[in-house]
Amino acid sequence: MAFPETITMDMARRRFFLRSGSGFGMAALAGLLADKPANAASATPQPHFTPRAKRVIYLHMIGAPSHLDLFENKPELVKRDGQECPESLLKGRRFAFIGGKMTLAGSRFQFQKKGRSGQELSNLLPHLCTVADEIAIVKTVHTEEINHAPAQMFLHTGFGRGGRPSIGSWLNYGLGSETENLPAYVVLLSGPLGGAGTTLWSSGFLPSVNQGIQFRTSGDPVLFLSNPQGQTREDRTQILQSINQLNSRRLATAGDPEIATRISQYEMAFRMQASVPDLMDISRETPATLASYGAKPGAASFANNCLLARRMIERGVRVVELYDADWDHHNSLERSLPRKAADVDQPMAALVRDLKQRGLLEETLVIWGAEFGRTPLRQGIDGDGKTVNPGRDHHKDAFCFWMAGGGIKGGITLGKTDDFGFAPVENPVHVHDLNATVLHLMGLDHEKLTFKYQGREYRLTDVHGNVVRELLA
């Protein structure tokens, strides 16, 4: 129950806002035209402690690559390729699709030790090998979900169902924005999204200002950002002024923070009409830079997106998330995996190298991974027991991530799995531990970064998670 004084003060406050509504709309617009948002004076959230990283570039491979053919060399698995899997290794394990006879599947690709650190990487990743001393490979990541959409949501939100905020939204909520002319959280796609879809960058129950914004690499970078045909920037200014007046009046009566978000989004969209075309024009890069990434102006590719990610963090975008599709190799792995590895190998290595050369790697955390890994078992066996274009099924119990920059100890391998790659035997890292570590590197305590919703305090790591200190430089 509210006290009488509180009610009186609230009514007076509402009368003030009502009478000043048009003034706020004009003030917002004036600040906008001066390249200063109307809410610029509001307090920016502060980290809990000194951060090791200021920005994140997250490279998510949709569908889950076979870590056993990229990062996990298992000589015993290769030796016993084609043999029936011992029952003891299968006890208590869940698989998404594979059934019947369980046959071990060794990798058909070669591994090499690279760099001063001796990181062991597949020959499918010759470019990544050149930055082996910059990356930390975690070989014992594990999750709770065995299907794509729930596992993708679990990785990004800490929960296998929709409705909760993504890690990018939590970072935006906890740290605020560093830029006035671009969103704090941007998403880029190469290939069809599939899986959990746009829930992966949803703000969930957090204020919608923390939502990720998808940029496109062809056509309008942001849908409906350009002025409609026949409308000038002056026309847009007048429309924005009128909308701001209406929204400001409604904000005064309702006090809904989502209305304030709407006002700021209109302002941001107006500023982005000037800032986004320059950002997305990678033809401004030198020929040498374009060649290093394998980027081609006008193309829609992972290479272009990696280069755009660097351009975005240079301009103050806090979180850039890249989704690359077509990694779900239940069959035809020997043909499909080399093609996909070639798509990402050069640009992601170029990204790490480019960030380092520009002095940005120390304060930019680069993360590569997927929702789960692939089984040490062969999938695609017919009724006669012969393999037909074999692949691998989903595997939640052990898979690989790599990280670089932003407080990460480069050149290390963390964790060890059994001889076949079924499960961790040293240093297991749960997805909650991984997310707790990302927040820690950004200066946030995962146990203190909370939001109260429907009577409960929520956090990204739910009630779990420990910082993986072995990864910290």
Which stretches of residues belong to each language-model region?
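Ligand-binding pockets and gating/stacking loops
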Residues: 1-473
